[in-house]
Amino acid sequence: MASNSYMKVVLSFFIFSFVISLSFAQSSNFTLPLKSVNLGNWLVTEGWMKPSRFDGIPNKDLLDGTKVQLMSTKLQKYLCAENGGGTIVVANRSSASAWETFRLWRINETFFNFRVNNKQFFGRFSQGQGNRIVAASTTAGYAQTFEIVRNSDDPNRVRLKASNGLFIQAVSDTSLTADYGGSSWDDSDPSVFKLQIVGTLQGEYQITNGYGPDKAPQIMRDHWNSYITDDDFKFLSSNGVNAVRVPVGWWIAKDPSPPKPFVGGSSQALDNAFIWAQKYGMKVIIDLHAAQGSQNGNDHSGARDGFQEWGDSYIPDTVSVIDYLAARYAKSSSLVAIALLNEPLAPGVTLDSLKNYYQQGYSAVRKYTQNAYVIFSNRLGPADSKELLSFASSLSRTVIDVHYYNLFSDSFKNLNVQQNIDYINNQRASALSAVATSNGPLSYVGEWTCEWNVNGASKEDYQRFGKAQLDVYGRATFGWGYWAYKCAQNHWSLKWMIENGYITLV
Ligand SMILES: *[C@@H]1O[C@H](CO)[C@@H](O)[C@H](O)[C@H]1NC(C)=O
Ligand SMILES: *[C@@H]1O[C@H](CO)[C@@H](O)[C@H](O)[C@H]1NC(C)=O
Ligand SMILES: *[C@@H]1O[C@H](CO)[C@@H](O)[C@H](O)[C@H]1NC(C)=O
Protein backbone atom coordinates (compact mmCIF):
# COMPACT_ATOMS: atom_id res chain seq x y z
CA MET A 1 0.00 0.00 0.00
CA ALA A 2 2.69 2.41 1.12
CA SER A 3 4.91 1.76 -1.89
CA ASN A 4 1.89 1.96 -4.11
CA SER A 5 1.01 5.43 -2.90
CA TYR A 6 4.71 6.37 -3.08
CA MET A 7 4.67 5.34 -6.72
CA LYS A 8 1.57 7.42 -7.24
CA VAL A 9 3.32 10.44 -5.83
CA VAL A 10 6.38 9.90 -8.00
CA LEU A 11 4.23 9.25 -11.00
CA SER A 12 2.12 12.33 -10.47
CA PHE A 13 5.30 14.36 -10.01
CA PHE A 14 6.51 13.21 -13.42
CA ILE A 15 3.14 13.85 -15.03
CA PHE A 16 3.08 17.23 -13.34
CA SER A 17 6.55 18.16 -14.64
CA PHE A 18 5.61 16.93 -18.07
CA VAL A 19 2.49 19.11 -18.09
CA ILE A 20 4.51 22.09 -16.85
CA SER A 21 7.22 21.66 -19.47
CA LEU A 22 4.59 21.16 -22.14
CA SER A 23 2.92 24.38 -21.19
CA PHE A 24 6.26 26.21 -21.26
CA ALA A 25 7.01 24.70 -24.63
CA GLN A 26 3.68 25.91 -25.87
CA SER A 27 4.04 29.39 -24.56
CA SER A 28 7.55 29.81 -25.87
CA ASN A 29 6.37 28.38 -29.18
CA PHE A 30 3.77 31.08 -29.46
CA THR A 31 4.35 33.70 -32.09
CA LEU A 32 2.42 36.69 -33.32
CA PRO A 33 0.45 37.43 -35.39
CA LEU A 34 -2.47 35.36 -34.17
CA LYS A 35 -5.09 33.73 -36.33
CA SER A 36 -8.10 33.93 -34.08
CA VAL A 37 -11.83 33.44 -34.15
CA ASN A 38 -14.54 35.10 -32.10
CA LEU A 39 -16.63 32.80 -29.94
CA GLY A 40 -19.57 35.15 -30.48
CA ASN A 41 -23.04 34.33 -29.11
CA TRP A 42 -21.58 32.02 -26.48
CA LEU A 43 -21.26 34.02 -23.26
CA VAL A 44 -22.87 37.16 -24.68
CA THR A 45 -26.07 36.44 -26.57
CA GLU A 46 -26.67 37.83 -30.07
CA GLY A 47 -30.06 36.63 -31.20
CA TRP A 48 -29.48 37.01 -34.95
CA MET A 49 -26.71 34.42 -34.78
CA LYS A 50 -29.11 31.72 -33.58
CA PRO A 51 -32.68 33.02 -33.50
CA SER A 52 -34.14 29.68 -32.42
CA ARG A 53 -32.76 30.19 -28.91
CA PHE A 54 -35.61 32.67 -28.39
CA ASP A 55 -38.36 30.36 -29.61
CA GLY A 56 -39.51 29.22 -26.19
CA ILE A 57 -40.21 32.74 -24.91
CA PRO A 58 -43.89 33.64 -24.58
CA ASN A 59 -44.69 36.91 -26.41
CA LYS A 60 -41.18 36.69 -27.81
CA ASP A 61 -41.77 39.75 -30.00
CA LEU A 62 -42.24 41.89 -26.87
CA LEU A 63 -38.82 41.76 -25.26
CA ASP A 64 -36.90 44.45 -23.39
CA GLY A 65 -35.96 47.27 -25.69
CA THR A 66 -38.55 46.47 -28.36
CA LYS A 67 -39.52 49.81 -29.92
CA VAL A 68 -43.26 50.20 -30.36
CA GLN A 69 -45.56 52.84 -31.79
CA LEU A 70 -49.23 52.97 -30.83
CA MET A 71 -51.96 54.31 -33.09
CA SER A 72 -55.46 54.96 -31.82
CA THR A 73 -57.82 53.11 -34.17
CA LYS A 74 -60.57 55.61 -33.37
CA LEU A 75 -58.57 58.78 -34.02
CA GLN A 76 -56.14 57.24 -36.52
CA LYS A 77 -53.41 59.16 -34.68
CA TYR A 78 -50.23 58.07 -32.94
CA LEU A 79 -49.53 58.47 -29.27
CA CYS A 80 -46.77 61.00 -28.63
CA ALA A 81 -44.80 61.93 -25.54
CA GLU A 82 -44.80 65.69 -26.07
CA ASN A 83 -41.28 67.14 -26.30
CA GLY A 84 -39.96 63.58 -26.21
CA GLY A 85 -40.93 63.21 -22.55
CA GLY A 86 -41.24 65.19 -19.34
CA THR A 87 -44.86 66.22 -19.84
CA ILE A 88 -48.18 64.98 -21.22
CA VAL A 89 -48.79 62.14 -23.64
CA VAL A 90 -51.16 63.02 -26.49
CA ALA A 91 -52.73 61.24 -29.46
CA ASN A 92 -52.53 63.80 -32.22
CA ARG A 93 -49.72 62.76 -34.56
CA SER A 94 -50.44 61.54 -38.06
CA SER A 95 -46.96 60.07 -38.48
CA ALA A 96 -44.53 58.57 -36.02
CA SER A 97 -40.84 59.02 -35.28
CA ALA A 98 -38.76 59.41 -32.09
CA TRP A 99 -41.31 61.08 -29.77
CA GLU A 100 -43.96 58.57 -30.89
CA THR A 101 -41.70 55.58 -30.17
CA PHE A 102 -41.65 53.77 -26.81
CA ARG A 103 -39.14 51.22 -25.59
CA LEU A 104 -40.52 48.30 -23.63
CA TRP A 105 -39.24 47.19 -20.26
CA ARG A 106 -40.61 43.73 -19.69
CA ILE A 107 -41.88 42.85 -16.20
CA ASN A 108 -43.17 39.47 -17.28
CA GLU A 109 -44.78 38.08 -20.41
CA THR A 110 -47.76 40.46 -20.32
CA PHE A 111 -46.76 43.40 -18.06
CA PHE A 112 -44.54 46.20 -19.31
CA ASN A 113 -43.21 49.71 -18.75
CA PHE A 114 -42.92 52.13 -21.67
CA ARG A 115 -39.79 54.29 -21.83
CA VAL A 116 -40.01 57.44 -23.92
CA ASN A 117 -37.40 59.27 -25.98
CA ASN A 118 -36.11 61.38 -23.07
CA LYS A 119 -35.92 58.25 -20.90
CA GLN A 120 -38.93 58.85 -18.67
CA PHE A 121 -41.67 56.25 -18.34
CA PHE A 122 -45.25 57.01 -19.09
CA GLY A 123 -47.82 56.34 -16.42
CA ARG A 124 -50.99 57.41 -14.64
CA PHE A 125 -50.93 60.76 -12.96
CA SER A 126 -53.97 60.84 -10.73
CA GLN A 127 -53.64 63.84 -8.40
CA GLY A 128 -56.49 66.03 -9.61
CA GLN A 129 -55.74 64.97 -13.15
CA GLY A 130 -58.29 62.21 -13.61
CA ASN A 131 -55.75 59.46 -14.37
CA ARG A 132 -54.14 61.41 -17.16
CA ILE A 133 -51.20 59.71 -18.91
CA VAL A 134 -47.96 61.64 -18.52
CA ALA A 135 -44.33 60.78 -19.25
CA ALA A 136 -42.80 62.36 -16.20
CA SER A 137 -41.33 59.63 -14.02
CA THR A 138 -37.68 58.64 -14.33
CA THR A 139 -38.38 55.39 -12.51
CA ALA A 140 -40.93 52.71 -13.30
CA GLY A 141 -43.30 51.62 -10.56
CA TYR A 142 -46.88 50.58 -10.08
CA ALA A 143 -48.34 53.63 -11.89
CA GLN A 144 -46.03 53.06 -14.86
CA THR A 145 -46.89 49.38 -15.30
CA PHE A 146 -49.38 48.28 -17.95
CA GLU A 147 -50.70 44.95 -19.10
CA ILE A 148 -50.63 44.61 -22.87
CA VAL A 149 -53.84 42.78 -23.78
CA ARG A 150 -53.54 41.45 -27.32
CA ASN A 151 -56.46 40.62 -29.58
CA SER A 152 -56.54 36.87 -30.16
CA ASP A 153 -57.07 37.25 -33.92
CA ASP A 154 -54.59 40.06 -34.44
CA PRO A 155 -51.78 40.31 -31.87
CA ASN A 156 -50.98 43.80 -33.11
CA ARG A 157 -54.35 45.12 -31.92
CA VAL A 158 -53.86 45.89 -28.25
CA ARG A 159 -55.42 47.52 -25.23
CA LEU A 160 -53.31 48.78 -22.33
CA LYS A 161 -54.61 47.99 -18.86
CA ALA A 162 -53.31 50.25 -16.12
CA SER A 163 -52.65 49.19 -12.53
CA ASN A 164 -56.03 50.63 -11.48
CA GLY A 165 -57.62 47.88 -13.58
CA LEU A 166 -58.87 50.32 -16.23
CA PHE A 167 -57.75 50.81 -19.83
CA ILE A 168 -55.98 53.72 -21.46
CA GLN A 169 -58.31 55.55 -23.82
CA ALA A 170 -57.76 58.31 -26.34
CA VAL A 171 -60.78 60.47 -25.45
CA SER A 172 -59.65 63.21 -27.78
CA ASP A 173 -56.38 63.87 -29.52
CA THR A 174 -55.02 65.79 -26.55
CA SER A 175 -56.51 63.75 -23.74
CA LEU A 176 -55.22 60.32 -22.87
CA THR A 177 -56.55 58.82 -19.66
CA ALA A 178 -56.50 55.48 -17.87
CA ASP A 179 -60.16 55.26 -16.90
CA TYR A 180 -61.96 53.10 -19.45
CA GLY A 181 -63.89 50.00 -18.46
CA GLY A 182 -65.16 48.80 -21.84
CA SER A 183 -63.92 45.74 -23.66
CA SER A 184 -64.80 45.91 -27.34
CA TRP A 185 -62.27 45.50 -30.14
CA ASP A 186 -64.06 47.83 -32.57
CA ASP A 187 -62.07 50.44 -34.45
CA SER A 188 -64.31 53.05 -32.86
CA ASP A 189 -63.37 51.92 -29.35
CA PRO A 190 -61.16 54.63 -27.79
CA SER A 191 -59.05 52.02 -25.95
CA VAL A 192 -57.98 50.04 -29.01
CA PHE A 193 -54.53 50.73 -30.45
CA LYS A 194 -52.57 49.38 -33.35
CA LEU A 195 -49.18 48.23 -32.11
CA GLN A 196 -46.31 48.63 -34.57
CA ILE A 197 -42.94 47.12 -33.73
CA VAL A 198 -40.20 49.26 -35.25
CA GLY A 199 -37.10 47.92 -33.55
CA THR A 200 -36.00 44.87 -31.59
CA LEU A 201 -33.08 43.81 -29.43
CA GLN A 202 -32.02 40.21 -28.89
CA GLY A 203 -29.17 40.24 -26.44
CA GLU A 204 -28.36 38.67 -23.08
CA TYR A 205 -30.82 40.90 -21.23
CA GLN A 206 -33.63 40.02 -23.61
CA ILE A 207 -33.12 36.27 -23.55
CA THR A 208 -32.68 35.99 -19.78
CA ASN A 209 -35.52 38.34 -18.89
CA GLY A 210 -37.64 36.83 -21.66
CA TYR A 211 -37.42 33.33 -20.24
CA GLY A 212 -37.65 34.73 -16.74
CA PRO A 213 -36.08 33.63 -13.45
CA ASP A 214 -37.60 30.14 -13.43
CA LYS A 215 -36.41 29.03 -16.86
CA ALA A 216 -33.46 31.22 -17.81
CA PRO A 217 -30.78 29.61 -15.58
CA GLN A 218 -31.19 26.14 -17.06
CA ILE A 219 -31.52 27.44 -20.60
CA MET A 220 -28.37 29.54 -20.38
CA ARG A 221 -26.30 26.81 -18.73
CA ASP A 222 -27.40 24.25 -21.33
CA HIS A 223 -26.37 26.70 -24.03
CA TRP A 224 -22.96 27.41 -22.47
CA ASN A 225 -22.27 23.69 -22.11
CA SER A 226 -23.27 22.72 -25.63
CA TYR A 227 -22.51 25.67 -27.91
CA ILE A 228 -18.74 25.49 -27.46
CA THR A 229 -16.98 22.29 -26.39
CA ASP A 230 -13.61 20.59 -26.37
CA ASP A 231 -14.34 19.39 -29.94
CA ASP A 232 -14.54 22.96 -31.16
CA PHE A 233 -11.07 23.77 -29.88
CA LYS A 234 -9.84 20.56 -31.45
CA PHE A 235 -11.44 21.54 -34.76
CA LEU A 236 -9.97 25.03 -34.63
CA SER A 237 -6.46 24.00 -33.67
CA SER A 238 -6.32 21.37 -36.38
CA ASN A 239 -7.51 23.89 -38.96
CA GLY A 240 -4.91 26.55 -38.36
CA VAL A 241 -6.65 28.78 -35.82
CA ASN A 242 -4.38 29.40 -32.84
CA ALA A 243 -6.44 31.73 -30.64
CA VAL A 244 -10.00 32.51 -29.59
CA ARG A 245 -11.44 35.90 -28.71
CA VAL A 246 -14.13 35.32 -26.12
CA PRO A 247 -16.74 38.07 -25.67
CA VAL A 248 -17.89 38.32 -22.04
CA GLY A 249 -20.36 40.56 -20.23
CA TRP A 250 -19.86 42.61 -17.05
CA TRP A 251 -22.12 40.24 -15.11
CA ILE A 252 -19.47 37.50 -15.26
CA ALA A 253 -17.63 39.38 -12.49
CA LYS A 254 -20.69 38.93 -10.23
CA ASP A 255 -20.69 35.19 -10.73
CA PRO A 256 -22.23 33.00 -9.36
CA SER A 257 -25.10 35.35 -8.49
CA PRO A 258 -25.25 38.28 -10.90
CA PRO A 259 -28.08 40.79 -10.66
CA LYS A 260 -31.29 39.63 -12.34
CA PRO A 261 -32.12 38.82 -15.04
CA PHE A 262 -28.54 37.68 -15.72
CA VAL A 263 -27.69 34.12 -14.88
CA GLY A 264 -24.76 32.70 -12.91
CA GLY A 265 -22.30 30.13 -14.21
CA SER A 266 -20.64 31.91 -17.11
CA SER A 267 -17.23 32.02 -15.41
CA GLN A 268 -17.25 28.22 -15.26
CA ALA A 269 -17.75 28.22 -19.01
CA LEU A 270 -14.85 30.64 -19.47
CA ASP A 271 -12.70 28.40 -17.25
CA ASN A 272 -13.46 25.58 -19.69
CA ALA A 273 -12.25 27.69 -22.61
CA PHE A 274 -8.90 28.03 -20.82
CA ILE A 275 -8.71 24.29 -20.15
CA TRP A 276 -9.40 23.45 -23.80
CA ALA A 277 -7.06 26.16 -25.10
CA GLN A 278 -4.30 24.72 -22.92
CA LYS A 279 -5.02 21.22 -24.18
CA TYR A 280 -4.73 22.22 -27.85
CA GLY A 281 -1.93 24.77 -27.51
CA MET A 282 -4.17 27.76 -28.24
CA LYS A 283 -4.36 31.28 -26.83
CA VAL A 284 -7.31 33.12 -25.28
CA ILE A 285 -8.20 36.77 -25.65
CA ILE A 286 -10.82 37.82 -23.11
CA ASP A 287 -12.95 40.59 -24.56
CA LEU A 288 -15.22 42.71 -22.37
CA HIS A 289 -18.02 42.99 -24.89
CA ALA A 290 -20.80 44.27 -22.67
CA ALA A 291 -20.14 46.97 -20.07
CA GLN A 292 -22.69 48.07 -17.51
CA GLY A 293 -24.56 51.08 -18.88
CA SER A 294 -23.88 49.96 -22.48
CA GLN A 295 -21.01 51.48 -24.41
CA ASN A 296 -22.79 51.36 -27.78
CA GLY A 297 -26.49 50.63 -27.27
CA ASN A 298 -26.33 47.38 -29.23
CA ASP A 299 -27.91 44.17 -28.02
CA HIS A 300 -24.43 42.62 -27.82
CA SER A 301 -23.53 45.21 -25.18
CA GLY A 302 -26.08 43.65 -22.82
CA ALA A 303 -28.29 46.74 -23.08
CA ARG A 304 -31.81 46.53 -21.70
CA ASP A 305 -33.39 49.06 -24.01
CA GLY A 306 -30.69 50.30 -26.37
CA PHE A 307 -29.89 53.58 -24.65
CA GLN A 308 -26.13 54.12 -24.54
CA GLU A 309 -25.34 55.25 -21.00
CA TRP A 310 -21.79 54.11 -20.26
CA GLY A 311 -19.57 57.03 -19.18
CA ASP A 312 -17.45 58.31 -16.30
CA SER A 313 -19.83 57.13 -13.60
CA TYR A 314 -19.49 53.55 -14.86
CA ILE A 315 -15.67 53.50 -14.97
CA PRO A 316 -15.06 52.14 -11.43
CA ASP A 317 -17.45 49.22 -11.96
CA THR A 318 -16.03 48.45 -15.38
CA VAL A 319 -12.46 48.51 -14.05
CA SER A 320 -13.47 46.05 -11.35
CA VAL A 321 -14.71 43.65 -14.03
CA ILE A 322 -11.26 43.80 -15.64
CA ASP A 323 -9.68 43.29 -12.23
CA TYR A 324 -11.81 40.18 -11.71
CA LEU A 325 -10.88 38.73 -15.10
CA ALA A 326 -7.17 39.52 -14.77
CA ALA A 327 -7.00 38.09 -11.25
CA ARG A 328 -8.74 34.90 -12.31
CA TYR A 329 -6.83 34.18 -15.52
CA ALA A 330 -3.43 35.92 -15.29
CA LYS A 331 -1.69 32.70 -14.25
CA SER A 332 -2.94 30.71 -17.19
CA SER A 333 -0.28 30.38 -19.87
CA SER A 334 -3.09 30.49 -22.44
CA LEU A 335 -4.07 34.04 -21.60
CA VAL A 336 -2.60 36.23 -24.33
CA ALA A 337 -4.63 39.43 -23.95
CA ILE A 338 -7.50 41.22 -22.31
CA ALA A 339 -9.56 43.56 -24.48
CA LEU A 340 -10.87 46.28 -22.20
CA LEU A 341 -14.04 47.34 -24.03
CA ASN A 342 -15.57 46.26 -27.31
CA GLU A 343 -16.68 48.92 -29.79
CA PRO A 344 -17.23 52.01 -27.66
CA LEU A 345 -19.35 54.32 -29.79
CA ALA A 346 -18.54 57.97 -30.47
CA PRO A 347 -19.67 60.58 -29.69
CA GLY A 348 -21.64 59.05 -26.78
CA VAL A 349 -18.39 57.66 -25.37
CA THR A 350 -15.99 60.60 -25.31
CA LEU A 351 -12.30 60.20 -25.96
CA ASP A 352 -11.52 61.61 -22.50
CA SER A 353 -13.71 59.08 -20.70
CA LEU A 354 -12.36 56.27 -22.79
CA LYS A 355 -8.68 57.11 -22.16
CA ASN A 356 -9.40 57.54 -18.49
CA TYR A 357 -10.97 54.08 -18.43
CA TYR A 358 -8.29 52.48 -20.60
CA GLN A 359 -5.57 53.84 -18.30
CA GLN A 360 -7.24 52.37 -15.23
CA GLY A 361 -8.15 49.11 -16.97
CA TYR A 362 -4.55 48.77 -18.13
CA SER A 363 -3.32 49.19 -14.55
CA ALA A 364 -5.81 46.61 -13.33
CA VAL A 365 -4.39 44.06 -15.76
CA ARG A 366 -0.78 44.97 -14.85
CA LYS A 367 -1.48 44.31 -11.17
CA TYR A 368 -1.56 40.63 -12.11
CA THR A 369 0.50 40.20 -15.26
CA GLN A 370 3.27 41.95 -17.14
CA ASN A 371 2.96 39.62 -20.11
CA ALA A 372 -0.64 39.73 -21.21
CA TYR A 373 -1.33 42.26 -23.92
CA VAL A 374 -3.93 44.92 -23.24
CA ILE A 375 -6.19 45.60 -26.20
CA PHE A 376 -7.80 48.99 -26.78
CA SER A 377 -10.71 48.94 -29.20
CA ASN A 378 -10.93 52.02 -31.38
CA ARG A 379 -14.19 53.95 -31.13
CA LEU A 380 -16.85 53.29 -33.72
CA GLY A 381 -18.71 56.23 -35.20
CA PRO A 382 -17.20 59.60 -35.96
CA ALA A 383 -13.69 59.17 -34.53
CA ASP A 384 -10.12 59.34 -35.82
CA SER A 385 -8.66 55.84 -36.12
CA LYS A 386 -5.31 57.17 -34.82
CA GLU A 387 -6.71 58.88 -31.73
CA LEU A 388 -5.37 56.22 -29.32
CA LEU A 389 -1.93 55.75 -30.84
CA SER A 390 0.15 58.11 -28.74
CA PHE A 391 -1.68 57.12 -25.55
CA ALA A 392 -1.15 53.42 -26.27
CA SER A 393 2.51 54.01 -27.18
CA SER A 394 3.23 55.23 -23.67
CA LEU A 395 2.26 51.82 -22.23
CA SER A 396 3.88 48.45 -22.76
CA ARG A 397 2.38 45.51 -24.64
CA THR A 398 -0.70 47.27 -25.96
CA VAL A 399 -2.75 46.61 -29.06
CA ILE A 400 -5.18 48.72 -31.11
CA ASP A 401 -8.24 46.76 -32.22
CA VAL A 402 -10.05 47.71 -35.43
CA HIS A 403 -13.14 46.03 -36.87
CA TYR A 404 -13.49 45.87 -40.66
CA TYR A 405 -16.82 44.92 -42.24
CA ASN A 406 -17.85 45.75 -45.81
CA LEU A 407 -21.32 46.20 -44.36
CA PHE A 408 -23.30 48.58 -42.12
CA SER A 409 -22.74 51.62 -44.32
CA ASP A 410 -24.38 52.82 -47.50
CA SER A 411 -21.01 53.05 -49.18
CA PHE A 412 -20.91 49.25 -49.46
CA LYS A 413 -24.47 48.86 -50.68
CA ASN A 414 -23.81 48.76 -54.39
CA LEU A 415 -20.28 47.37 -54.57
CA ASN A 416 -19.80 44.34 -56.79
CA VAL A 417 -17.41 41.47 -56.10
CA GLN A 418 -14.31 43.11 -57.57
CA GLN A 419 -15.08 46.46 -55.97
CA ASN A 420 -15.33 44.80 -52.57
CA ILE A 421 -11.99 43.08 -53.11
CA ASP A 422 -10.40 46.31 -54.34
CA TYR A 423 -11.70 48.03 -51.23
CA ILE A 424 -9.85 45.51 -49.07
CA ASN A 425 -6.63 45.85 -51.05
CA ASN A 426 -6.72 49.64 -51.11
CA GLN A 427 -8.77 51.36 -48.39
CA ARG A 428 -8.48 48.63 -45.75
CA ALA A 429 -4.78 48.12 -46.39
CA SER A 430 -4.05 51.81 -45.94
CA ALA A 431 -6.40 52.13 -42.93
CA LEU A 432 -4.55 49.26 -41.29
CA SER A 433 -1.11 50.65 -42.03
CA ALA A 434 -2.22 53.95 -40.48
CA VAL A 435 -2.65 52.24 -37.09
CA ALA A 436 0.44 50.03 -37.48
CA THR A 437 3.24 52.37 -36.40
CA SER A 438 6.71 51.01 -35.81
CA ASN A 439 7.22 51.93 -32.14
CA GLY A 440 3.59 52.09 -31.13
CA PRO A 441 1.04 49.51 -30.12
CA LEU A 442 0.47 46.36 -32.15
CA SER A 443 -2.53 46.17 -34.48
CA TYR A 444 -5.38 43.65 -34.44
CA VAL A 445 -8.26 43.28 -36.87
CA GLY A 446 -10.33 41.78 -34.09
CA GLU A 447 -13.47 41.40 -36.20
CA TRP A 448 -14.01 40.76 -39.90
CA THR A 449 -16.12 38.36 -41.91
CA CYS A 450 -16.80 37.14 -45.43
CA GLU A 451 -20.37 38.45 -45.61
CA TRP A 452 -21.07 41.39 -47.88
CA ASN A 453 -23.93 43.04 -49.78
CA VAL A 454 -23.31 41.15 -53.01
CA ASN A 455 -26.28 39.08 -54.13
CA GLY A 456 -25.79 35.75 -55.84
CA ALA A 457 -22.03 35.59 -55.34
CA SER A 458 -20.41 32.28 -56.26
CA LYS A 459 -18.29 30.14 -54.00
CA GLU A 460 -15.23 31.35 -55.88
CA ASP A 461 -16.25 34.99 -55.25
CA TYR A 462 -16.40 34.31 -51.52
CA GLN A 463 -13.07 32.51 -51.66
CA ARG A 464 -11.43 35.49 -53.34
CA PHE A 465 -13.00 37.90 -50.86
CA GLY A 466 -11.77 35.76 -47.97
CA LYS A 467 -8.29 35.43 -49.45
CA ALA A 468 -7.96 39.19 -50.01
CA GLN A 469 -8.89 39.83 -46.39
CA LEU A 470 -6.53 37.16 -45.07
CA ASP A 471 -3.70 38.68 -47.10
CA VAL A 472 -4.32 42.24 -45.94
CA TYR A 473 -5.33 41.52 -42.35
CA GLY A 474 -2.39 39.12 -42.12
CA ARG A 475 -0.27 42.28 -41.96
CA ALA A 476 -1.81 43.26 -38.62
CA THR A 477 1.04 42.79 -36.16
CA PHE A 478 -1.06 41.22 -33.39
CA GLY A 479 -3.27 39.26 -35.77
CA TRP A 480 -6.85 38.98 -36.89
CA GLY A 481 -10.12 37.51 -35.58
CA TYR A 482 -12.94 36.16 -37.75
CA TRP A 483 -16.49 36.98 -36.66
CA ALA A 484 -17.64 34.39 -35.78
CA TYR A 485 -17.06 30.70 -35.12
CA LYS A 486 -20.69 29.52 -35.28
CA CYS A 487 -23.57 31.38 -36.85
CA ALA A 488 -26.94 30.53 -38.37
CA GLN A 489 -25.87 32.63 -41.37
CA ASN A 490 -23.25 30.49 -43.05
CA HIS A 491 -20.78 33.07 -44.30
CA TRP A 492 -20.48 34.51 -40.81
CA SER A 493 -19.41 31.10 -39.50
CA LEU A 494 -15.72 30.26 -39.79
CA LYS A 495 -16.62 26.66 -38.94
CA TRP A 496 -18.96 26.47 -41.94
CA MET A 497 -16.49 28.32 -44.19
CA ILE A 498 -13.69 25.89 -43.33
CA GLU A 499 -15.86 22.77 -43.53
CA ASN A 500 -17.16 23.80 -46.93
CA GLY A 501 -13.84 24.79 -48.41
CA TYR A 502 -14.44 28.55 -48.56
CA ILE A 503 -11.51 29.35 -46.27
CA THR A 504 -8.35 27.32 -45.84
CA LEU A 505 -5.77 28.25 -43.22
CA VAL A 506 -3.54 25.18 -43.23
C1 LIG B 1 5.33 24.65 -32.23
O1 LIG B 1 5.13 25.16 -33.53
C2 LIG B 1 5.39 24.24 -34.55
C3 LIG B 1 5.25 24.97 -35.89
O2 LIG B 1 4.10 25.76 -35.94
C4 LIG B 1 4.42 23.06 -34.43
O3 LIG B 1 4.67 22.12 -35.43
C5 LIG B 1 4.59 22.42 -33.05
O4 LIG B 1 3.65 21.41 -32.88
C6 LIG B 1 4.43 23.46 -31.96
N1 LIG B 1 4.73 22.88 -30.68
C7 LIG B 1 3.93 22.97 -29.64
C8 LIG B 1 4.41 22.33 -28.39
O5 LIG B 1 2.87 23.55 -29.67
C1 LIG C 1 -50.76 67.99 -30.05
O1 LIG C 1 -51.30 68.42 -28.82
C2 LIG C 1 -50.45 69.23 -28.04
C3 LIG C 1 -51.15 69.53 -26.73
O2 LIG C 1 -52.34 70.22 -26.93
C4 LIG C 1 -50.06 70.48 -28.80
O3 LIG C 1 -49.13 71.24 -28.03
C5 LIG C 1 -49.40 70.08 -30.12
O4 LIG C 1 -49.11 71.23 -30.88
C6 LIG C 1 -50.33 69.18 -30.90
N1 LIG C 1 -49.64 68.71 -32.09
C7 LIG C 1 -50.25 68.54 -33.25
C8 LIG C 1 -49.40 68.05 -34.38
O5 LIG C 1 -51.44 68.75 -33.39
C1 LIG D 1 -46.76 39.97 -13.97
O1 LIG D 1 -46.46 41.17 -13.30
C2 LIG D 1 -47.61 41.80 -12.78
C3 LIG D 1 -47.18 43.18 -12.28
O2 LIG D 1 -46.12 43.10 -11.38
C4 LIG D 1 -48.22 40.93 -11.70
O3 LIG D 1 -49.37 41.56 -11.17
C5 LIG D 1 -48.60 39.60 -12.35
O4 LIG D 1 -49.10 38.72 -11.38
C6 LIG D 1 -47.41 38.98 -13.03
N1 LIG D 1 -47.85 37.83 -13.79
C7 LIG D 1 -47.17 36.70 -13.80
C8 LIG D 1 -47.72 35.62 -14.68
O5 LIG D 1 -46.17 36.54 -13.14
Q: Which residues fall in each region the model found?
A:
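Short, solvent-exposed loop/turn elements at domain surfaces
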Residues: 43-50, 78, 408-411
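Lectin-like carbohydrate-binding module/patch detector with strong preference for beta-trefoil
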Residues: 60-199
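N-terminal secretory signal peptides that target proteins for export/translocation
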Residues: 1-6
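Active-site region of glycoside hydrolase catalytic domains
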Residues: 31, 198, 294-454, 470-471, ...
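Aromatic-rich peripheral "rim/lid" segments of glycoside hydrolase catalytic domains that contact
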Residues: 458-506
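Extracellular low-complexity, O-glycosylation-prone Ser/Thr/Pro/Gly-rich "stalks"
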Residues: 27-28, 51-63, 189-193, 494-506
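Cleavable N-terminal signal peptides of Sec/SRP-targeted secreted and luminal proteins
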Residues: 8-25
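Active-site mouth of glycoside hydrolases
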Residues: 32-36, 41-66, 199-372, 383-384
